[in-house]
Design a protein with these regions (language model features):
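A short, structured N-terminal alpha-helical element that caps or precedes a catalytic domain
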Residues: 1-65, 71-72
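Core AdoMet radical
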Residues: 10, 45-48, 112-208, 219-229, ...
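Canonical Radical SAM [4Fe-4S] cluster-binding loop centered on the CxxxCxxC motif
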Residues: 17, 92-128
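Short, charged, surface-exposed secondary-structure boundary motifs
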Residues: 42-44, 56, 72-79, 109, ...
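Ser/Thr/Gly-rich flexible loops in soluble cytosolic domains mediating phosphotransfer, phosphorylation
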Residues: 64-89
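Catalytic cores of alpha/beta
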Residues: 228-245
C-alpha cells in the first residue's frame, strides 16, 4: 500500500497521530511518505489541530481526516495508538513527545479536551514515551497533576537521566508546597509552564511561583500562558506576572 500523510497545520511541531499512523503502516510493510498532490495514493491521512488552519482543497475526497481543526473528535484505533511514534517524519525533532494522561477535570469553555477525551485517566508511563536516543521528553498532558498516575510518573522520573517539559502548562490550582517540592526535583528542559487564563486564577499562579522559589526554582524559569479575551484585563495579569519575574506569552 502507498500511503500519503498530510500535516494540515504545518507548524513544525511533530504531529503525534501522523507519526503513529506512519509507524503502523510501515510495520505492515507499506510505503509511507508526505502527501504530494501530484501523486496517487492508496490511502491519504490528513490531521488538523487548529480550527484557524485553512483546509487544503486539493486533498482527495476519500482522505481520512482527524483532529479538532476539522471539528472531529475521532481517535486512533487502539492498534495504531499503541505504536511508538515514527520520528523520522520530523528529523529536526530530537526529543520524545507523548502523554502520561488523557482528559481533564476542568471544563473551561474555550477548551475541547473534556468533550474530546473525557475526564482524566492514566495513559502511558514515561518509559513508554522516552526515546532511546534522547533524554528529553515533551509531555502534552492537559492536566497531569489531576491524576494520581501523573504524579506517580513525575515521582518516578526524579533522579533519572531525563529532562522534561509539560508544554501545555500545569494547573496552578493543584500546586501545593508538596507538589512544588516534587516538581522542583525534576530536570527541566527549560521552563516550568503554567496558565493564567482569568483574573481569578492570577493569585493562585503567583502563589505557585512563590512556592517554586522556596524550592530553588527562580521565577524566570517559570513560563505562563495568558489567554487574551479582554486586552486590558490580560495586560494587568501580564504586568503582575512580569513583576513576579515570570516569563509569559499571550495567546
Amino acid at each position: 500500500m502507498f500511503v500519503g500523510l498530510h500535516d494540515s497545520d504545518n507548524t513544525n511541531f511533530p504531529n503525534l497521530a501522523l507519526m503513529k499512523i506512519s509507524a503502523w503502516h510501515k510495520a505492515q510493510g507499506d510505503i509511507v511518505e508526505w502527501w504530494n498532490p501530484m501523486l496517487n495514493y492508496d490511502r491519504v491521512y490528513s490531521s488538523k489541530v487548529f480550527t484557524f488552519t485553512p483546509e487544503c482543497v486539493y486533498l482527495p475526497p476519500d482522505t481520512i481526516k482527524g483532529g479538532t481543526g476539522y471539528g472531529l473528535y475521532n481517535e486512533l484505533p487502539d492498534e495504531i495508538d499503541a505504536m511508538p511514534p515514527d520520528y523520522s517524519l520530523y528529523p529536526a525533532c530530537k526529543h520524545a513527545i507523548g502523554f502520561l494522561t488523557r482528559g481533564c477535570i476542568r471544563h473551561c469553555p474555550w477548551c475541547v479536551v473534556p468533550r474530546k477525551e473525557g475526564t482524566i485517566r492514566p495513559y502511558r508511563t514515561w518509559q513508554e514515551i522516552k526515546r532511546p536516543d534522547s533524554r528529553d521528553i515533551v509531555f502534552m498532558d492537559n492536566n497531569v497533576l489531576a491524576c494520581p498516575h501523573g504524579l506517580e510518573q513525575i515521582q518516578a522520573m526524579i533522579g533519572r537521566d531525563v529532562r522534561v517539559d509539560f508544554n501545555q502548562g500545569l494547573d496552578a490550582r493543584l500546586i501545593t508546597s508538596d507538589v512544588a517540592k516534587l516538581l522542583a526535583r525534576l530536570k527541566w528542559i527549560r521552563f516550568i509552564r503554567m496558565s493564567c487564563d482569568t483574573d481569578a486564577i492570577l493569585p493562585v499562579v503567583l502563589d505557585a511561583i512563590r512556592m517554586f522559589a522556596v524550592e530553588g526554582v527562580k521565577p524566570y524559569r517559570v513560563f505562563v500562558y495568558l489567554l487574551v479575551q479582554n486586552v486590558d484585563r490580560a495586560e494587568q495579569r501580564a504586568l503582575a506576572l512580569r513583576d513576579a519575574g515570570a516569563d509569559r506569552k499571550s495567546q
